[in-house]
Amino acid sequence: MNLEDPIGIIELGNVNLKCLIFQINKNNSSEILSTAITPSEGIHNDVVVNLTKASNAIRLSIGTAEKKAKISLKKINVVFEQPDFLCTKFSKHKKIDGSKIHRHDIEFLLKEAKKQLILNDKNQSIIHIFNHNYIVDGKIFMEEPIDVFADSLSHEMTFITVPKNNLKNINQVFIDCDIEIERLISHTFTLGVKLLNVRELQLGSALINLGYKKISLGLFKNLALVHSVTLPIGTDHITNDISK
């Protein structure tokens, strides 16, 4: 993708779908080309419950944004957050025996974590991997300790996964809309990047998002989302309970 190619993002929701088209200019500034907020149908807590209704709603949202921007998207980024999301943390260890740490050492630990995750639950698909700690001889490194001499290396990471069938249904909706999903993005992660500054993301922060049908909690540290959970309880449930 070229620097100035239009980029599309759609955020799934219970009430509305939000679509944004923008581009990154040569001076690295972003320019919004169009936005669209349209009614959501066939989607509950970002899970597709009716393929036909969801396809029609998403087609309308993307089409409205494309018409405003006077362009046609081939790919789009999808922002969503399901109560079925799983957050799994791993700490993998490797002996270095006084040698330098190389990139392939870190890649080995990452592959080992992914392998264990898949063995534990083959029905999950990975949408995010966050590297948040490297521990070299008992000392914490915030960045990759490439070329550092060490006896041991531990790599701490967090995986965000979603049930494969949930993902298949989302993919099918966008296939029916004749558009390819470029990337799947956690809504909690996007909120953290938007609302928290670098210091807050580095030192540690908690973010709670009260939605209409769900509540999401994200814990951030070392510039990573280290824990995330979404509950199928929202402001709608709270309001209904109070009114009784």
Residues of each region from the PLM?
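Nucleotide/phosphate-binding catalytic cleft detector across ATP-hydrolyzing
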Residues: M1-N16, L20-K75, F80-A206, A224-V226, ...
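Glycine-rich phosphate-binding loop of actin/hexokinase-like ATP-binding domains
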Residues: L203-D241
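Active-site core segments that coordinate phosphate-bearing ligands/cofactors
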Residues: K244
